[in-house]
């Protein structure tokens, strides 16, 4: 279980429609619900649903930040807007919260809020670009589910975000940019682990942009090395899993 998720759940009870947790924490919550283990993760990646967020949510969120006593409070410039809160005073709170919003100043913070500028790293930059894509944002809203009182992106909807992030980081690396290979491997492995939670008989209605990206991912992954046994995926080959992924999504 992610450290601090219980206090987050208690504090934001009643706000389930206003956010969605994605990334490693979402994977951890979904896997835990099914009795499966997941890699250690310490940060909560939070996407605001801008159509549902109001002033009251902004105040409530900042009150949580203050109560947790986060030592570092950072904010990016531009759109999408990104906030990072880290180093709380107690492990009752998440070690880090990373919050994304497509709308500039969607959260109206109080005048006494002190936020320092935040440089964009490769993972943030990649996710920010994905969330600016209308197809992916609509897909995210479509895939929200509540698990044990917390809103997360369901596994079948989380897979395309992980796949897209993997392709984006691979493209950057091939273009000569410095990219942490651990991030590339993380997204790739998460896609395959999440398939453990998928019903192969289900079809997911998918915006055309997301559908096309998933077909590209399947095609590109055919030439990649994936140790399915090391990932704990028993009884399925890489080829079988890729076929399942390719057949999971259908254009809306």
List where the protein language model places each region.
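Compositionally biased terminal segments of proteins
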Residues: 1-252
